[in-house]
Every structure is written in structure tokens, then in C-alpha cells.
Design a protein with these regions (language model features):
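A structural signal for short, well-ordered beta-strand segments and their strand-loop junctions
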Residues: 137-140, 197, 206-211, 348-352
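Catalytic core of the metallo-beta-lactamase
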Residues: 2-96, 150-238, 263-268, 272-273, ...
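Active-site HxH/HxHxD metal-binding segment of metal-dependent hydrolases
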Residues: 101-174
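Short, catalytically relevant binding-site loops at active-site mouths
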Residues: 144-146, 213-215, 356
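Short glycine-rich, polar/acidic loop-and-turn segments at beta strand-coil junctions
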Residues: 60-61, 77-79, 86-90, 112, ...
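Short active-site-adjacent helix-start/loop capping segments
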Residues: 65-66, 92-95, 119-122, 146-148, ...
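Cap/insert and terminal regions of metallo-dependent hydrolase folds
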Residues: 88, 100-110, 116-118, 123-131, ...
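Beta-sheet entry/capping signal
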Residues: 82-83, 110, 136, 204-205, ...
Length: 414
């Protein structure tokens, strides 16, 4: 089989915004099922992580211009064929990029859905699998859907080709190349949380879905392809014009990270309704794209220090939302899962969001879960977690979700 190692030509960045993407190559027909930005228009960037072995495919997604990367990883099998971890939207462009790999390395043999709760991962799998009719789909156990729990076949998964990942990773046909371990399911009453981490032994690469991220100081390449969200959030007031500068892109990205990680950090205030409306009236851009001039954000002067405390130079991090709302419901199970992974041999992590490649050791991976055991200098500031703590209390005090257990674990350690 001929191997062409040439890079796929990438698209040049558009001026500002996805509204200018008219090509059918980027069209995602099922966008209304999960109507989040960029809706029906999704670019894909393919990057070769390890020559002839590992590739990432980045798209973007978000709400109210709080946009982050979402990532699929493809690994070449030692024999012939490809394994796909966490598919993204199978646009014409995306599938063309995948088929270039198929021509060189063989067909897509396995498609992995590593989560049960992430709609942004789940709803791509069925349409993606239909593009590769010989692939077997493996899903994390205990799949569910909301508001009605439907069979996977009703959600577009190919019934005859979809299997559940067994607890024992030796029972799958790719066990000679991969290990995996399953976290969960963590009962949240409203649903469950589960994640399957994969280890590609030959390349010493760990694949995770949502559990670990690394926050970069500059916007990832796929985010730079659509600059308007960056520039929208870079402003300090609705009265400011939207200006495309490198400084503004970085500024907007850092604020987007604070939004996506904390919802509302301690350095963000909400102006009065009167001020919001007055500023909107005086905004130089009252278009629908700019939300008619509405900009309900008032960043404090020290906002950038909050980003630095969050990023900590790109160290592996468990997202604050998982820390405050999910993993603290099952601290012992989470730590056992993290301990299992820390016993594996790897030197890099590919997550489904934010930084595409994290150079990290098993010890550094395990340290990211220290928040479940004790407070330390690595912990995130409590003042920035306050909004998430308040949401948590609103949910568990009436019994909507189970109460957190991590605090009890810390007290027991003392």
C-alpha cells in the first residue's frame, strides 16, 4: 500500500467569522440536534502528531461565542487499518481528510465512543459510522439519553455493528495494541457520568475525553480560524469597536477559558441592566452577530491573574466543572481509576478539548486528581469556584443530585 507522507493542505483563515463559510465541504446537516456554535458550518484541521501513526482532527464548538476545540484522534493499527477515538462532525472536508489516511493505511476498523453523557461526542458517532460501513463501533457501557432514554439504534448508531466495551480490555480485538480503563458510571440522579481512557502502548500515548485538559496561553489553531468570538470577548465594553489584533485574540482567548472553566469567575462582574442597555445603544456594532450590542460583562483589572492561576503554565488539569459537580460524587472510584492510569507507561496525553497534545508523565496525570484528597498549592482558588459551588448546592440540597463525597474524604485523611 503506497504511503504518501505529504501534509494535507489546510484552509487559509477567513477574515473574522464562520458566516463567510459557504462551501458545502464544511456543512454539518444534523446541527439542529445539538444547536451550538458554529451550527451548520464546521471546519476541520488535521495534524500529524506522530509520523505515520497518530493524527488529530480539530473542530470548534461553543455557546455565546465561548468556543473551544473538540477533537477526534485516529491511530494507525500495527497490522492494517485505523482506530478512531471520539469522532467529530463528519463533514465532507473531515471525511475527505480521513479517507486520505484510509488510502494509505487501510480502512477504519474501530470507532470508539469514550463517554456516555457528552452529547457533543455522542451525536457525531452514528453519522460518522455510516461513512465507514465496515467499522465496528465500541461504546462506553451504560449509555443513556435525555429526556427519554432511547436505544442507541434510535440515536443513529448502526445496530449490527455497535458493541459495548467490556470491563476487561483483553476481550476486544485491538487488545494487543491498546489498554483501556473505565471510570464510572458515576450516578448523578439526572443521569450518569462515565469516561474510557485509552493507552496506545507502542507510542506511549494516553487518550482521554473530558477528564484532563491543559489550558494554553494562546488560542489553538482551530480557534484562530474563526476570530470573531476571540475579538468579541476581548472588549472591556460594548462601546469598544471589534479590532483584530494579536493582543486582542490572546486577550479574548484567556477570557473564553475563564468562561468555559468557571462559568463566572471571581474577576467577572455583571453590570446593571441600565448600563448594559445604555452601552448597547452606543455600541458601534448592533448587528445580530454582535448580539445587538449587548455585552453584560465587566472584567476586573486583575482578571488576567485568574487565568494564570487556572492555566499554571499548561499543567494537566481536571476541569473545574468536573471537580465541583461530578467527580466529587465518586472520589474513591475516580482515584482508583487515576491510579490505574498512573501505572501505565506514557509520555503524552491527547484530550478531546483545549491543548491538542500534553507532554506529561503518569505522575503529573495523577497529581491532577489531588483535589479529591487534600488542599494544596495546586488547588484552584475557591473564590473562582464559588459560582460552581453555588450551582452544586442548588442541585444537591433539594436532592436533585447526590451530595458531594470528596469533602468527607479529605476530613477522613486528616
Amino acid at each position: 500500500m503506497k504511503k504518501d507522507n505529504s501534509r494535507v493542505s489546510q484552509i487559509e483563515p477567513n477574515d473574522l467569522n464562520h458566516d463567510r463559510l459557504d462551501s458545502q465541504d464544511y456543512y454539518w446537516r444534523f446541527w439542529a440536534n445539538v444547536p451550538i456554535y458554529p451550527y451548520s458550518k464546521r471546519r476541520t484541521i488535521r495534524r500529524e502528531v506522530l509520523p505515520n501513526t497518530i493524527w488529530t482532527f480539530d473542530q470548534l464548538q461553543g455557546i455565546f461565542y465561548v468556543v473551544v476545540p473538540i477533537r477526534m484522534t485516529i491511530i494507525r493499527l500495527e497490522t492494517v487499518g485505523l482506530l478512531v477515538y471520539a469522532p467529530v462532525a463528519p463533514t465532507r472536508q473531515c471525511i475527505a481528510l480521513v479517507r486520505e489516511l484510509v488510502e494509505q493505511y487501510g480502512e477504519v476498523k474501530y470507532i470508539i465512543l469514550p463517554t456516555i453523557s457528552g452529547l457533543e461526542h455522542k451525536y457525531f458517532v452514528g453519522p460518522f459510522a455510516r461513512k465507514f460501513p465496515n467499522a465496528t463501533v465500541y461504546v462506553a457501557p451504560n449509555q443513556w439519553s435525555f429526556p427519554v432514554d432511547l436505544p442507541l439504534s434510535w440515536l443513529g448508531f448502526p445496530a449490527k455493528r455497535t458493541k459495548v466495551l467490556p470491563e476487561d480490555s483483553k476481550q476486544v480485538p485491538f487488545s494487543d495494541e491498546f489498554d483501556y480503563t473505565i471510570l464510572g458510571d458515576i450516578d448523578l440522579k439526572l443521569g450518569q457520568f462515565e469516561e474510557v481512557a485509552f493507552l496506545h502502548r507502542r507510542s506511549q500515548t494516553l487518550l482521554v475525553a473530558d477528564s484532563i485538559v491543559s489550558i494554553p496561553k494562546q488560542p489553538p489553531e482551530i480557534i484562530e480560524q474563526d476570530r470573531f468570538p476571540l475579538l468579541f470577548h476581548a472588549r472591556d465594553s460594548a462601546r469598544e469597536p471589534i479590532k483584530d489584533t494579536l493582543e486582542n485574540r490572546i486577550k479574548g482567548w484567556k477570557r473564553i477559558c475563564l468562561f468555559s472553566m468557571y462559568f463566572r469567575s471571581s474577576v467577572l462582574n455583571v453590570p446593571s441592566i441600565g448600563k448594559i442597555l445604555t452601552d448597547a445603544w452606543r455600541s458601534p456594532d448592533k448587528s445580530s452577530r454582535a448580539y445587538w450590542g449587548l455585552f453584560p460583562f465587566d472584567w476586573q483589572a486583575n482578571w488576567e491573574s485568574a487565568f494564570d492561576k487556572l492555566s499554571q503554565n499548561g499543567r494537566p488539569l481536571v476541569a473545574p466543572i468536573l471537580q465541583a459537580l461530578i467527580l466529587n460524587r465518586a472520589p474513591l472510584e475516580t482515584l482508583e481509576w487515576a491510579d490505574t492510569i498512573a501505572g501505565w507507561k506514557f509520555n503524552k496525553i491527547i484530550p478531546c478539548h483545549f491543548t491538542p497534545l500534553i507532554h506529561a508523565t503518569p505522575k503529573e496525570f495523577r497529581q491532577a486528581f489531588d483535589f479529591l484528597e487534600s488542599s494544596s498549592h495546586r488547588s484552584l482558588p475557591e473564590e473562582d469556584l464559588e459560582t460552581l459551588r453555588n450551582i452544586d448546592a442548588l442541585l444537591y440540597k433539594p436532592g436533585i443530585v447526590p451530595p458531594p463525597k470528596a469533602e468527607n474524604l479529605r476530613l477522613k485523611d486528616k
